[in-house]
Regions:
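Intrinsically disordered, low-complexity segments enriched in Gly and acidic/Ser/Thr residues
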Residues: 213-277
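Extracytoplasmic low-complexity, Pro/Thr/Ser/Ala/Gly-rich segments
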Residues: 38-129
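Conserved Ser/Thr-centered positions that define the repeating blades of beta-propeller domains
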Residues: 110-111, 156-159, 220-222, 260-264, ...
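Short glycine/acidic-enriched loop and turn motifs that connect beta-strands
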Residues: 92, 97-102, 147-151, 251-255, ...
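Blade-level signature of beta-propeller repeat domains, shared across WD40, Kelch, NHL, RCC1
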Residues: 282-301
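Repeated scaffold domains used in trafficking and secretory/extracellular systems
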Residues: 77-86, 125-136, 169-181, 197-207, ...
Length: 301
């Protein structure tokens, strides 16, 4: 009887081996493809969205308001910056007041009409502040000043062209100045006057007339009792002549591009003279006004 191997006969309904291999390979490829697709989609960045423009609802940029130009108000120098100017027989004296205990005064003398000046401030006496300045005995000078560490009120006089000074009590009785102990009082040879304002400065006197500056206005007294306005605006300095007439140095931009010097019955414009610096004015022996303003020293004619 013939022998039949079991391997030579396949069971009915079984799938051939090669077909199984093909199916497995197809499945592997399908799974790999799906995995690659998933990874690719994960790594791809989302499309960039265009920025959205937010509409404005009537927003307007405010118009800048121009800053108004401040009005410049002129006023006479007061306190340490106050100036004094005096002359006699061709000798000139000038000074800045200073402030006793803090700002040193400066006193100078000239014999060549202000071309050169010599410092004659008596520092060796401890001068602290100058309150008035006037010529004496033709070519000498005198002043009312606060002296020493305690600011003692004294009259001072020189007989040596300003090299040496000595106290003199008669000067206090004959001088006009603002009382340092009471700035609202004007001391005169005829007595003490109440000032016409709260901050008087630039007081000068001559032949019974006393004149003082209040801000940029000026007043005068001829009876040692009452004051009357000069009726001039912008007064920076004044002086009183030997016959009691008042001359002023003024800032008046409407009529003068510089310093306007107003004498009784006449006015002279000195061009290019600063009106924003301390000023002093006086009359020489011929009655001609001289002005010391800033670094300028000049006559009107």
């Amino acid at each position: 009887m013939a022998y039949r191997s079991s391997t030579s006969r396949r069971s009915r309904g079984s799938v051939p081996t090669w077909v199984s291999i093909v199916i497995v390979a197809v499945l592997i490829l399908a799974v790999g493809g799906l995995s690659w697709l998933a990874i690719t989609r994960t790594q791809t960045p989302p499309p960039t969205e265009a920025p959205r423009v937010t509409p404005t609802m009537g927003v307007e940029t405010p118009t800048a308001t121009p800053t108004p130009t401040p009005t410049v108000t002129v006023a006479a120098a007061a306190g340490p910056a106050q100036r004094f100017l005096a002359t006699s027989e061709g000798v000139w004296w000038r000074a800045t007041a200073g402030q006793c205990g803090s700002i040193e005064p400066l006193l100078e003398r000239s014999t060549d009409a202000g071309q050169t000046w010599s410092d004659v401030t008596p520092r060796y006496l401890g001068i602290g502040q100058i309150l008035s300045l006037s010529p004496y005995a033709a070519d000498q000078g005198q002043m009312v000043a606060l002296m020493g560490a305690d600011c003692t009120l004294q009259g001072m006089r020189t007989f040596t062209d300003g090299q040496f000074w000595e106290p003199n009590g008669d000067i206090l009785a004959s001088s006009t100045y603002i009382d340092p102990a009471n700035p609202l009082a004007v001391v005169t040879p005829a007595g003490t006057l109440d000032a016409p304002c709260g901050a008087p400065t630039g007081v000068r006197a001559g032949d019974g007339t006393t004149a003082v500056i209040c801000g940029s206005d000026a007043s005068q007294s001829t009876d040692a009792a009452t004051w009357s306005p000069l009726g001039q605006a912008g007064v920076l300095a004044l002086t009183v002549s030997g016959d009691g007439q008042v001359t002023t140095a003024r800032a008046d931009a409407a009529s003068c591009d510089g310093m306007l010097v107003a004498e009784p019955g006449a006015a002279t414009c000195i061009p290019s003279i600063p009106t924003d610096a301390p000023v002093a004015v006086t009359l020489d022996g011929e009655g001609v006004p001289w002005v010391w303003a800033g670094d300028t020293f000049v006559s009107t004619r």
